[in-house]
Amino acid sequence: MQVNKTRKFLRTLSIQNEPIIVGCSGGPDSMCLLRLLYDEGYKIICAHIDHSIREESVDERIFVEEYCRNLGIIFEPLKLEKKSENEFYYRKKRYNFYKKLADKYDTPYIATAHHGDDLIETVLMRLTRGSNLKGYTGFKKFIKKKNMFL
């Protein structure tokens, strides 16, 4: 993540008085985004999802929860049962959780962090599924999905 570029972008937004749901796994990208938004004065709701896939997931939840508590950030966890190896199953559960939190906190804003490897993985998945040229583009800054901005 290019921290200065991201910080500059965040300062162009006029939503600092609005709550923002931040998808946070506990990895370096989402922790950096969480901290940047905190430093810029955003009202953050940290959405942490334990997919129950890796043994370390409990430790990651505890780490993120303690980090949020120390900064006074609202922490909203979700623990999923491992039911599928299908990426789409977990994506649907993830976005349903974000939607539930967006409704609870009356905000359309959801932020997630991604890095170059995520983009490569996404493009490769789209290639194997026979996507059109639009599927090979990079991540967009904003995606409007129903009444939410991701």
Regions found by a protein language model. Name each.
Residues 1-150:
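Core alpha/beta nucleotide-donor-binding catalytic domains of modification enzymes
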